[in-house]
Design a protein with these regions (language model features):
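Secretory targeting and sorting signals
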Residues: 2-27
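Metal-cofactor-binding active-site regions of metalloenzymes
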Residues: 28-517
């Protein structure tokens, strides 16, 4: 959707001073299947593991592929939300910190006060994010999810400006691809669902929703909304001009989210709308289910929602499915609710990717489930900080290492980096420190994030069992000037083009790191 400009390697060279003090690695080192440069950089990484500043600098400049699990309203910084609230003349209650339209009465203060009054600003930031949060009467889970209701009024009027901040941040982190979640035509879908009602006969319900162009009207509305958001985005970023900001280089796709805690009629309507969008507009790549998985309505209707997806999936083969599943932990729900969500999301809900998957070890016959995930190449989107803040699951209690040991593909993601007050480098740093990842591990995590992205076209790689290039692109070093056959492949296949670009970024990164020695 957006891929207008490629970033340079100037920032890589700028970090050389932090990386320079190490002695050079042995020049001839080479990893199996890798380049000599790769082996030398791997040794370099091993030498800076205990140096926080140099490790952070190294990981910040590392090409990190894509972010596959990202909620736009939770990804934008709290500071930008405050700024937007002030510009839009909103109010913020000084006791509940809920944003609302004016006039500001009683305990409500103008949002502008959070710009000029530092004490109030700090209170708002703490209420709208996880900054300085310490569990007490309120759990991390409850505080995290409550933030969305507090800043909600400030988070929907300027999606283009919000996306601009997110993609600029990603470009600074050397990421090139984003899938972010939005609720398309939210009000219209809710109204249509209320008018139509629910029917366990999904085929009949679908026909009623499609009748008289009702869903198509919402499709057209959602596409128009995205057109306007992207116009705002491109205006903010100056894309296509000499002043283009770095975020213009990030390719963006949208996941249409459905609210799993809503009434069944609304969930079905939202899923159907998302499927139709993915079939008509390549910018809308997939559908997902959001809201806490542990809410009672989510638990009560879990099987029903998976059956909805089972019905819709064969009707919309171009619509990808990624599902939040297993964002649970013992004590949050009763034991029975930990036993099947991931398995059912894959086998019934046709999920190609799973977001979170934290409770996998609690599922029935978890060893068989892990084999199934590995055999089917179902990717797990892993937001380590989010899982710690919401579920208090981290370190060796987290299944990240278990998934990797079991051959299940994984990719690091941010989830809601604005709420969490983190970025993707923080997640890579956390993973390296906790799980002793090698340089090859890091490259493969980044490669996997692009390989499993829902961006169109063929892959650069022969298959998902390793990173061996397809025949058309084997005659030149990856990421350099391609042969005519390879160039044709890259021209016609956006996924392969992103992957080739990343291989070039790896080469630039490795050369810059070693020049800084």
């Amino acid at each position: 959707m957006i891929s207008l400009r490629r970033t340079t390697t100037a920032a890589l060279v700028a970090c050389a001073a932090l990386l320079a003090p190490l002695a050079p690695a042995q020049a001839g080192t080479q990893l199996p299947g890798g380049r000599p440069l790769e082996g030398r950089v791997a040794a370099f990484l091993d030498g800076i593991r205990q140096d926080p500043a140099r490790l952070d600098a190294f990981l910040r400049q590392l090409p990190k592929g894509g972010d596959l699990h990202n909620h736009l309203s939770g990804a934008v910084s709290t500071e930008l939300l405050i700024q937007l609230a002030a510009e839009d003349g909103l109010c913020i209650d000084s006791e509940t910190f809920v944003s609302a339209t004016g006039p500001c009465q009683g305990t409500a203060r103008p949002a502008q006060d959070a710009v000029t009054d530092q004490d109030f600003r700090t209170q708002v930031i703490r209420s709208w994010s996880m900054q300085d949060f310490a569990p007490g009467q309120e759990s991390g889970h409850d505080h995290f999810f409550a933030t969305f209701g507090k800043f909600g009024e400030a988070s929907w009027r300027h999606p283009g400006r919000m996306l601009a901040e997110v993609t600029d941040t990603m470009a600074a982190q050397h990421q090139s691809y984003l899938e972010t979640m939005l609720t398309p035509a939210s009000g219209g879908a809710a109204a249509l669902a209320a008018k139509t009602g629910f029917d366990q006969d999904f085929a009949a319900l679908r026909q009623r929703l499609l009748a008289d162009g009702q869903i198509q009207t919402l499709v057209d509305q959602a596409r128009g909304d995205l057109d306007r958001a992207m116009a705002e985005y491109q205006d903010t970023e100056h894309c296509g001009t000499a002043q283009a900001r770095p975020g213009c280089a990030v390719t963006v796709r949208i996941q249409s989210q459905a609210s799993r805690a809503a009434a069944p009629a609304r969930v079905f309507t939202q899923l159907l709308l998302g499927m139709e969008l993915a079939s008509q507009d390549q910018r809308f790549a997939a559908v997902n289910l959001v809201q806490p998985e542990d809410y009672q309505a989510s638990l009560d209707n879990y099987d029903l929602q998976m059956r909805m997806l089972d019905f819709l999936h064969p009707l919309y083969p171009n619509a990808h499915i990624s599902l939040h599943a297993g964002e649970l932990a013992p004590g949050l729900v009763k034991p029975e609710d930990l036993r099947f969500h991931i398995r059912q999301a894959v086998l019934t809900g046709h999920a190609e990717r799973i977001g979170h998957g934290v409770d996998v070890a609690n599922e029935d016959d978890s060893a068989d489930l892990l084999r199934t995930l590995a055999e089917r190449k179902v990717l797990i989107e892993v937001p380590l900080t989010s899982n710690d803040q919401i579920l208090q699951v981290s370190g060796q209690d987290h299944p990240f290492a278990l998934y990797r040991k079991s051959g299940v593909p994984t990719a690091l993601s941010t989830d809601d980096p604005g709420v969490e007050r983190i970025d993707i480098t923080h997640e890579y740093l956390r993973a390296v420190r906790t799980y002793q990842l090698t340089y090859r591990d890091l490259k493969d995590l980044a490669r996997t994030s692009l390989e499993y992205g829902f961006v169109g076209g063929r892959s650069l790689w022969q298959d998902r069992n390793g990173y061996r290039p397809v025949a058309e692109c084997q005659d030149r070093p990856l990421g350099t000037k391609p042969t005519s056959a390879c160039a044709a492949l890259l021209r016609d296949n956006p996924k392969a083009a992103l992957e080739w670009q990343q291989e070039g970024a790896f080469r630039d990164f490795e050369q810059a790191v070693l020049r800084g020695k």
